[in-house]
A protein has these predicted regions:
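Conserved beta-strand positions in repeat-built beta-propeller and related beta-rich domains
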Residues: 98, 103-107, 139-145, 174-175, ...
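A short beta-strand motif characteristic of beta-propeller blades
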Residues: 76-86, 117-124, 156-164, 199-214, ...
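Repeated scaffold domains used in trafficking and secretory/extracellular systems
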Residues: 85-93, 125-136, 166-178, 212-224, ...
């Protein structure tokens, strides 16, 4: 009992010290100390703890402070744009292109387009796994190697990309300038294809230099000038010129558990990081510093996010 009491006093002292930092506008110091205190109090707030009631009160105080410091905006009632619950289509992916939103899944033959209150079905002979907005149309990829472009509302005939290996599987795709970038399943390797895009037009190139470290088991990919890869351990790897430049673990509260996807913010100013298991979207700048977090119960099991051109809506 005495040990539990002393540990709680230590947590309370850290909390008071952090409050002092806040008065002095030293938010980073306060944030770091409160995160430390929060980890300490979790053990004391367990059901078996003899001081659980007091520990829970301290935990709530710390959590309130961390919520404010970590720029969490709770979204109570996000506006419903379309409800696919009673249709024959279940969207698994979403992408914004020009002034429309496009929804697709690998089992639905075609793609759904919405603009305002208008819904349009664009038929195809196959479903799509990945998509990327480019200056020459919306690129749509169907495993293992088919790619086609949607231009002016018309889906052009698909053609086959040459794969680097016969057993290559792509799990993420993005675009930058005149190139498409693919993330290879399991290996963390990135394959780059350059314009023009037609069958066998460009030999696939492994973009990361051969001797450089790769994020094995990586889950997501984005390019904003640097190439960012979301690794299986929640680290974000930054590459430039085919070389590993940096590896970042997000220092945010709530502590990341299972980050799922990264996508570029408008004007390539940073990244949005999706964590559906905690119902949130984390916005960071290119250096990995926190911009803002959006949290909602409606974001649990979130699969994708898209932004308006001006960045005011998601």
């Amino acid at each position: 009992m005495i040990d539990f009491r002393n540990r709680l006093i230590d947590v309370q002292e850290k909390t008071v010290k952090a409050q002092g930092y806040l008065i002095l506008n030293q938010e980073e110091k306060a944030n770091n100390l409160l995160k430390e205190a929060f980890k300490d109090v979790l053990v004391l707030a367990k059901s078996s703890s003899p001081i659980r009631k007091e520990a829970l009160a301290v935990q709530a105080l710390i959590e309130d402070n961390l919520t404010a410091l970590n720029k969490i905006e709770d979204v109570k009632d996000p506006k419903l744009v379309f409800d696919f619950a009673n249709s024959d289509f279940i969207p698994q992916h979403l992408i914004a292109f020009e002034d429309s939103l496009y929804y697709f899944n690998p089992y639905y033959k075609g793609i759904i387009r919405t603009s305002g209150d208008t819904l349009e079905r664009i038929n195809a002979d196959y479903g799509f796994n990945l998509a990327a907005a480019t200056s020459f149309g919306l690129a749509l990829f169907s495993k293992p190697d088919k790619i086609s472009f949607l231009k002016d509302g018309r889906l052009e005939p698909a053609f086959a990309l040459e794969l680097p290996k016969s057993d290559t599987v792509f799990i993420a795709m993005t675009s930058f300038k005149d190139s498409l970038y693919f993330l290879e399943k399991g290996t963390g390797m990135i394959i780059k294809y350059r314009e023009p895009f037609f069958e066998n037009a460009d030999q696939p190139k492994y973009w990361i230099q051969a001797q450089e470290k790769k994020a094995l088991g990586a889950k997501s990919l984005e390019v904003t000038g640097s190439v960012y890869v979301l690794a299986d351990d929640n680290a974000i790897w930054e590459y430039r010129g085919g070389l590993l430049l940096d590896k970042t673990y997000l220092s945010v509260f709530p502590f990341p558990q299972k980050l799922a996807k990264i996508t570029a913010l408008p004007s390539l100013s940073g990244l949005a990081v999706l964590e559906p298991s905690q119902g949130r979207i984390i916005l960071i700048d290119r250096q990995g510093s926190l911009i803002r977090q959006f949290r909602s119960e409606d974001f649990l099991n979130l699969k994708a996010v898209a932004f308006s051109k001006d960045g005011k809506f998601l």
